Amino acid sequence: MSRRGTAEKKTAKSDPIYRNRLVNMLVNRILKHGKKSLAYQIIYRAVKKIQQKTETNPLSVLRQAIRGVTPDIAVKSRRVGGSTHQVPIEIGSTQGKALAIRWLLAASRKRPGRNMAFKLSSELVDAAKGSGDAIRKKEETHKMAEANRAFAHFR
């Protein structure tokens, strides 16, 4: 029997301006080389651009975009008897949000445009509308999981 206690789950803190955990998760994922103030600048500029484009609450657009991109199911490689199978697994809400944020940032980095704030705002607006690269990535993942449903018993 182990003497070590169970580790506490860390909860995501909220950002200083909007008091929103999703914004802070975005900031931590966009962060490069420890430049958190630059990451905050990029996110806040993107939020302002969303406000200008949609003329609605930018945080609701952000929530809607992340909800639209969050996958329910994904595939994981599993080696069984010398061959590797793509096994579909269900994803929890926290892991799903993390994946969605990663996909949104990757899609916005690929976009052509002036700066990261502009590209991120465009990607978030598109994702909220149900289009864009991040949504395509989610649908692709769901198709992969559906195609490999036969291997679901390998979990």
Curated annotation (Swiss-Prot):
Q: What is its main location?
A: plastid
UniProt keywords (A-Z) are: Chloroplast, Plastid, Ribonucleoprotein, Ribosomal protein, RNA-binding, rRNA-binding
Q: Could you name the domain of life of the organism this protein comes from?
A: Eukaryota
CDD domains per the record? Answer: uS7_Chloroplast (cd14871)
**Gene name for this UniProt entry:** rps7-A
Q: Which Gene Ontology cellular component terms are annotated?
A: chloroplast; small ribosomal subunit
Identify this protein by name. Small ribosomal subunit protein uS7cz/uS7cy
Pfam families on file:
Ribosomal_S7
Q: Which family does it belong to?
A: Belongs to the universal ribosomal protein uS7 family.
Assembly and interaction partners: Part of the 30S ribosomal subunit.
Give the UniProt subcellular location, in the record's own words: Plastid, Chloroplast
This molecule's function is given as: One of the primary rRNA binding proteins, it binds directly to 16S rRNA where it nucleates assembly of the head domain of the 30S subunit.
MF (Gene Ontology): rRNA binding; structural constituent of ribosome
Output the InterPro entries linked to this UniProt entry: Ribosomal_uS7, Ribosomal_uS7_bac/org-type, Ribosomal_uS7_CS, Ribosomal_uS7_dom, Ribosomal_uS7_dom_sf
The Gene Ontology biological process annotation of the record reads: translation
